[in-house]
Amino acid sequence: MSEDLSKLHTSRMNKLQRKLRGEVGKAIGDYNMIEEGDRVMCCLSGGKDSYAMLDILLNLQQRAPIKFEIVAVNLDQKQPGFPEEVLPAYLDTLNVPYHIIEKDTYSVVREKIPEGQKTCSLCSRLRRGTLYGFAQKIGATKIALGHHRDDIIETLFLNMFFAGKQKAMPPKLLSDDGANMVIRPLAYSREKDIAEYAELKAFPIIPCNLCGSQENLKRAEVKDMLNLWDEHHPGRIESIFTAMQNTSPSQGVDREQFDFNSLQRDADAPLRGDVAESDLPAFDFVDVANNGHIDLDAAAKSRSENKIDIVSTYTP
C-alpha cells in the first residue's frame, strides 16, 4: 500500500471510529447500559458486528468517567470447520480477559431438527441459554450483544409483516427470569458503517454459515426492502428509527397500551378546539343551536372580535 493510500486508510478508519464511538457512547448514556463497577460480558461470534462492538467498548473503557470490566466470551458450538484458533489468537493481541466455551449444540440441533428444515431458531435458543448461564457463573452484570440499528428496524418489520406484532429489539432487555441484563451498545449504529470499519480494521472474520444453514429468507426480504428505501429515499431509515423512539399509545389502537374504555369527555371544558388548532385564535361562536355551516374564513375579517357567525343552518 502506498503512503498516500495508507494515510487515507488511517484517516477514514479514525473518522469511522469516532463516529461509532460517539453513537455507542450516546446509546450507553441514553439507556443507562453500563454503570460503575459493571462486569460486561461481550459475546463474540467472530462476525463483523461483535468484533466492532468489542473494539469500540475497549476504546470507550479507556475514556469513560466510570470504571467497568470487559470480559470477551465466545461459544464454540462445534460446527464443522469452525476455526478454533482464530478468536484466541486475536484476543491475545488485545490483552483482554476472555473465555472460550465449548458446547456441542450443533449435534443437538441436528438430532432435533429434520433434514432440510431451518435450524436457526433452536440453535439460537441453545446459544442464549448457555451464554445466560455462563454470565451468572462469572459474575457478569451485563451481557453485550452486537445487534445494530438495522437489526432493530428489520426485526420491527419482520414482526409486523409476519407475526402481527409491533415489536422490535430493545437496546436494553431484562431476561425473562430477571437474572440477566442484555445490552446492545450498537443500537444507534448503521450496519454499513460497521461493515466498513471491520474491513478497515481487518478483523479476522469467521463465516456465519458453517452449519450449512441458509439466510433467513424473510429477514433477507425485509433487508432488501429497507436497502431500497435507503437508496431511493435518503433519510427514511433514520426517520423510522426516530419514530420508534417517539411512540404515542393514545394515538394507536392497542388496548393493552392505552385504556380507551376509560376515556371521558369533560363537559365543563372551555370551547377552545383541539390541541392541533392551538396556533389558531380561540373563537366565540355566536350561535350553535342548530347544525350548520360555520364560516371559519370569517376569522380573517374579524380578528379583533374573534367571533364567527353561523352563515347557514339545516334542521331535518
UniProtKB/Swiss-Prot annotation:
Binds 1 [4Fe-4S] cluster per subunit. The cluster is chelated by three Cys residues, the fourth Fe has a free coordination site that may bind a sulfur atom transferred from the persulfide of IscS. Gene3D superfamilies: HUPs. A motif (PP-loop motif) lies at residues 45-50. CDD domains: TtcA-like. Its cofactor is Mg(2+); [4Fe-4S] cluster. Transmembrane segments: none annotated. [4Fe-4S] cluster binds at C120, C123, C211. This is tRNA-cytidine(32) 2-sulfurtransferase. One of its GO terms (cellular component) is cytoplasm. The gene is ttcA. It is found in: Cytoplasm. One of its GO terms (biological process) is tRNA thio-modification. Homodimer. One of its GO terms (molecular function) is sulfurtransferase activity. It catalyses: cytidine(32) in tRNA + S-sulfanyl-L-cysteinyl-[cysteine desulfurase] + AH2 + ATP = 2-thiocytidine(32) in tRNA + L-cysteinyl-[cysteine desulfurase] + A + AMP + diphosphate + H(+). Keywords: 4Fe-4S, ATP-binding, Cytoplasm, Iron, Iron-sulfur, Magnesium, Metal-binding, Nucleotide-binding, RNA-binding, Transferase, tRNA processing, tRNA-binding. Pathway: tRNA modification. The thiolation reaction likely consists of two steps: a first activation step by ATP to form an adenylated intermediate of the target base of tRNA, and a second nucleophilic substitution step of the sulfur (S) atom supplied by the hydrosulfide attached to the Fe-S cluster.
